[in-house]
């Protein structure tokens, strides 16, 4: 019996449909990989297309001030093997993690300034630092990047998962009186939360929580302008 030697043209509708389907699947896979499995080492590595639309998941590796921290990006979470196949980094390993972490500035809040370059520290600055360390250091958080500031830090809205769900870290700082609502109107990032933050801050004031329970001095914004 003679074998068929029919040639299937690349213009055959079935071939075209198959090619389109395969190409679409490949492009979708690449997009998912870039969005969920590519690790970003520093703030400058994060694509602008992810700002305000996506969350970066990872681990807080150090907290050096009352309103910012370093964060090791763990894309894909446990599905990418982090914590069981791939090791997550230890905390406070500064040399080992140099150029491997994203510096994050919490949006919408300002904590009392610590002593830097011979400048005096503000009252309650150490308490604010210790509160933030206790709350997030060594823990998994998610960061919604909003912008990059003059120090190449990602200004972001940060969430930590607790017994009652995802908690906004900036809001929790205001609730506990360890930070105030950010005052610089021209460069402030709030992700639409300013009015809520002001309400939470006002409640903390009335209850004299944290820094509201001590004698008032300069606000963090006033302090920075004074020692600029």
Swiss-Prot record:
Task: List the InterPro entries hit by this protein, alphabetically.
Answer: SNase_OB-fold_sf (IPR035437), Staphylococal_nuclease_OB-fold (IPR016071)
Question: Mind telling me which residue stretches traverse the membrane in this protein?
Answer: 15-37
Report residues binding Ca(2+). Answer: 110
Q: What is this enzyme's EC?
A: 3.1.-.-
Q: Name one Pfam family in it.
A: SNase
Query: Topology relative to the membrane, per the entry?
Result: Single-pass membrane protein
**Record bears the keyword Nuclease:** yes
Keywords for this entry? Answer: Calcium, Endonuclease, Hydrolase, Membrane, Metal-binding, Mitochondrion, Nuclease, Transmembrane, Transmembrane helix
GO molecular function annotation: endonuclease activity; metal ion binding
Active site per database record: 105, 113, 153
Origin superkingdom: Eukaryota
Tagged with keyword Transmembrane helix? yes
Subcellular location(s): the record lists: Mitochondrion; Membrane
What family classification does the UniProt entry report for this protein? Belongs to the LCL3 family.
Task: State what protein this is by name.
Answer: Probable endonuclease LCL3
Organism in which the protein naturally occurs: Komagataella phaffii (strain GS115 / ATCC 20864)
Q: Which gene encodes it?
A: LCL3
